[in-house]
Every structure is written in structure tokens, then in C-alpha cells.
UniProtKB/Swiss-Prot annotation:
Protein name (database record): Sodium/proline symporter
Taxonomic superkingdom: Bacteria
Taxonomy of the source species: Bacteria, Bacillati, Bacillota, Bacilli, Bacillales
Summary of the function given for this chain in its UniProt record: Catalyzes the sodium-dependent uptake of extracellular L-proline. Since most S.aureus strains are L-proline auxotrophs, this transporter may aid the bacterial persistence during an infection of tissues with low proline concentrations.
Catalytic activity: L-proline(in) + Na(+)(in) = L-proline(out) + Na(+)(out)
Any one GO biological process: proline transport
Species this protein is from: Staphylococcus aureus (strain bovine RF122 / ET3-1)
Family: Belongs to the sodium:solute symporter (SSF) (TC 2.A.21) family.
UniProt keyword Cell membrane present: yes
Amino acid sequence: MLTMGTALSQQVNANWQTYIMIAVYFLILIVIGFYGYKQATGNLSEYMLGGRSIGPYITALSAGASDMSGWMIMGLPGSVYGTGLSAMWITIGLTLGAYINYFVVAPRLRVYTELAGDAITLPDFFKNRLNDKNNVLKIISGLIIVVFFTLYTHSGFVSGGKLFESAFGLDYHFGLILVAFIVIFYTFFGGYLAVSITDFFQGVIMLIAMVMVPIVAMMNLNGWGTFHDVAAMKPTNLNLFKGLSFIGTISLFSWGLGYFGQPHIIVRFMSIKSHKMLPKARRLGISWMAVGLLGAVAVGLTGIAFVPAYHIKLEDPETLFIVMSQVLFHPLVGGFLLAAILAAIMSTISSQLLVTSSSLTEDFYKLIRGEEKAKTHQKEFVMIGRLSVLVVAIVAIAIAWNPNDTILNLVGNAWAGFGASFSPLVLFALYWKGLTRAGAVSGMVSGALVVIVWIAWIKPLAHINEIFGLYEIIPGFIVSVIVTYVVSKLTKKPGAFVETDLNKVRDIVREK
């Protein structure tokens, strides 16, 4: 999902107590990294997927934390502060999309990826599912993951650097390197297990923060009457449809379409110990998400009353959470709340680093070394996986070194890119026996191209007609579905093994 994106301009005071809290947070992450390293067996599946042994609670919060990023704590409250309750449509779309994802994608993907050659990456699953002997589908989907996630990761590093610059007055590059070092350390050594455990830990911190800040803010304002004050300041602040057209509402709501194709989220379903644990994970995960998003909305709404009440000049709405945490809380608690922002940022970075690393190792290096070498030289492949984490991180840091780099403009559209290219393909692969390799490649590429074309040439025409301002995932998703279906109908049908496998997956999923 989006990170802070813009410069954080509000300076806040930090003392030794705040630094201690941040240091304790970093120390816990390092310890978890060591734990993950000690648990490692030298097996690639273990390093990249935790050996498919992750429990439901870690699965749930890991999926949520890696999904939300700094957007939930920084971006969403800032958006609600600026536009009012109408910004909540995106939270409705995301929650509904995540909920459906647990039902429609999670069980079948967990079973099918293990059945289809024990695939540990999404491109590997596509290859095995469609018997892609030429590896065309695997290479193209792998390239999409590597390119877009490198850009995605760099935006997280930028957010981390700017947080330290804003909250502590430290040099941006120092903050960037510090965040990068900690994330690289526990991801490099601990692999998937460490990333999942840290995501769980960070998810708990994020949830506490999103509940604590709006409650304390209301206690220091007018209690529940704060919302009455917000409405009195401007009645449309609590209007769910304020300033939104039908196109605008649909665009915000359609963010949920992207969930079916986000590699760093759906890989969590692949790693759970059993598909039978998914209902428990779903209940916790969706509850966490709903409470967290509602808390973020509440931060934005209470912020509308908080800023004038405390005579604060808020130059950047995205700094609202930082300012409220520093003004309302003791520095020690303020440090904990700043750690929550770091948790949101770092949980996403680590997940994206690992997915990109697994794609480089499993989808490219294995093609060079061969399947047999991969089976007999597991430790070599684990080391390549670790080195890939380092390489991707270095590239992302290099791009992030200049925070004003124009590549930042592309990152906000990565969700749509993955959603349009992978979401339809994942659904077809899990449910339709008629899907062909040609249909899969054509649909995936066409979805990505439509998103790029829409962003570059169609959206700038929004001033002519509102329809051109439609969120790019919608046309990209629709075109991908149509192209995948039509091309599959016109090309050679897959073997009978596909229907057999689909039936087997369906039967296993139905087992209680």
C-alpha cells in the first residue's frame, strides 16, 4: 500500500527519554533477527517462507502491518484532517478487499502453491500452474516484482529518513542509513521468520498507537463532544460524501481490488501452517485492520479540533500524528508513538525486500543454476537470497538518497500496477481451468500497460471530463480480465492435469 511521500516540515522536541524508547525498539528488532537466524536450517523455503510453519496470529498481524505501511499512521489522518470524513471511503474499500481476500484467495493459494511444486514465490506458482516450460511468464512476473518493489522499498527508506529529520532534527541521510541498517540486519539474517515476528510485534505497536492517540486527544478536548465541535467548525467535516462525485467515490472504494495481487501480502497466506488456520487469522487480521483504520480516521477528525485549540500551525497535514503525540504525551510515551510510525514504515520495507529477494533467487538465479542445483545446494541459494536483500536495499537507498527524485511520483501507483497485472491472474489461476499461458502473459502485461498509460496520458485530461480522473486500477483490472479471458479462449487449452489439480485444491479447502 502509500507511505508519507512528502517532506515532513514540523519540528518537534526530542529528549533522552524519547531516544531511549527508540533505541529499545531497535534493540528488540535486532534480537528478533538473531532469533530468526538461529532458527534457520539452511533451507531456501525456510528462509523465504518460514517453512510454511507460521501460526494464525503472526500471519494476521504480519499481513496487516506489511500492508498498511506509514500510510495508516501518517497519510490517512492527514487526508481526513484535510478533507473530512469523505476520505473514509478508501478505508471501507480496503477493509472489504482484505476481507474478501481471506475468503477467495487465501485458502486456495495456500493449498495450490504447495501442490504446484511447492512454489515459494508468486511467479513460481504461475509457472507451475500453467506448465510454463519456457519460463516466459515467470520471468515477466518476476521482473514486475523486482522493478516495482525496488521503487516501493525506496519510498519507505525516504519516509524513515524524513521522520528522523522531522522528529529529531537529525540529518536526513543519517536517518535513512539508520532505518536501512536495522531493516537490512533482521531481514538479511532472520529471513521470513524474523520478518513475520517483527511484523507481529510492530502490528501490536501500531494498533496501540492508533487507539491511544485519538482517545487522549478527545480527553484533552471535549470528550465525545469533540466530534460535535468538528461538525460545528464545518458541517461537511462529518459528511461521508462531501466533495466527492460518483467517480471519486468509486475510485477510493476500488483500492480493495488490489489486494488479490499484492505479493508481499498474499505471501503471508502461502506461509501459514495450514489453510484450516486461516479463519482464525482472518478474524484477528480484519479486526486489527478495522480498529487501526478507524483509529487513523479518528486521529484526523480530532486533529481538526486539536490544531486550533492548541494554536498550532500545521504546515503539512501528514505530520498531524507526530505533533499530537509530542504535545499530548510524556516524552517516553511520545518515543513509543514515534516507534509506531517506524514500525509502520519498517514492516512494509522488510516484507518488500524479502519478496524481491525471493524473486531474484527463485525466479532468476534458479534459472541460471538449474532445478537440480537448487535441490542439492540449498545453502548456496539461501546465501544468494541474503545477498539479494542487500543488493535491492543498496539500490533502493541510492535512489532514496535524493528525496526529491522524480521516481517518487511512480511509487504511489505501484498498488494499482500490482493490482491490475496480478489480481485478475491470481483469481483466474485459482478458479478457472481454461486459463492458458498466453492468456496469463497477455492479461498481466495489458493490465500493467493500461495503468501506465492511464497515469501518463489519460489522468492529465481529468479537467476535460471527470471520467479521466478514475483511479487507474479500475480500467487496468477490467482490461486485464477481458484480455486474459479472450486470449485463453483463443489459444491451446491446458492439459487435463489442471482440472484435476483444481478439483483437488477445492476438495482440500472444503475439508474441515
